[in-house]
Amino acid sequence: MAHDLTTLLKRARDNYYLSLLLASAAKPLHFVSTRAALCLEQKVRRNGTSIRLPNGTNMAIARDSGVGIASALFWHGLDGYEPETSRTLRFFFERAATFVDVGANCGLYSLLGALWNPGLQVVAFEPVPAIFEGLKRNVLLNQLVGRVRCENVALSSQTGRTAFFLPKSEGGRDVESTGTLARESWQVRKGAAQIEVETVRFDEYTARHPMRVDLIKIDVEDFEADVLEGMKGVIARDRPFVVCEVLPRLHGNQRTRKIVEGLNYQPYWITPAGYVKVPKFDFGRGNLTDFLLSPVATPDVVLDGLDGLWESKERSCQQDRIAL
């Protein structure tokens, strides 16, 4: 019966009128089912989940920690959350020795990096105490205590203590994760609650905890200029690749642009189709908010993959060692 139906459908595909009839009938069903699936994903959230990674290991997100992230992974797997950024980081996870996760949240990328590459050392910075507790639980749950160092501080251009602006959560068990240290932000304009957090310059942090940095991820809600300012010494020394979210802002992200330009880094837009060289350090396009800041560049405007950049960086490092 099933075989006969399959045969009939195959024949119908090759017939203009039958294919028109079947496609016209199927389109409303497809629309309804797609809308229903989207509605289910939005309304039915997964509080805690575990997924199998391609290398055979399991990655778990604990209950009451990153419910939105856990839900995305539950419904769509590894590429369910920030797929282009995730694929970019996974490329570098395979090759890097040290990864610094700035604005780690519940630790998705810290966990993924450590599980993706057993030799990778990870340092995760998350200043919000409630979110930080979830980060620690996730590290413990995935048995990564010895490989992921969790720091309950915010990276900044200054070391000390300052106000952190945390919008009210819309409900559920998630702690609102769009908080920021930026004083000129929508969070402040909307009367977000304030908590006091510890801040540290990454250059000072590495003086106390020596490391050579290969890869940095920054997701700090309009505070990336201060984070980059506080780690300029490490960036100039180690020339790591930096994956950074830069959202369109009224100030045009001019400080970020000047810092990146001063470090002699080349920004690339991270897109579904590949990596596009950013002309004139343009961080203002609303539909493109995730960037790869590269210490090297190739002549190509569009890159399908990152092998060329990595190999160019390796050659540059070898030349520096020979020069020394």
What are these regions (language model features)?
Residues M1-R147, Q187, G191, H209, ...:
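S-adenosyl-L-methionine
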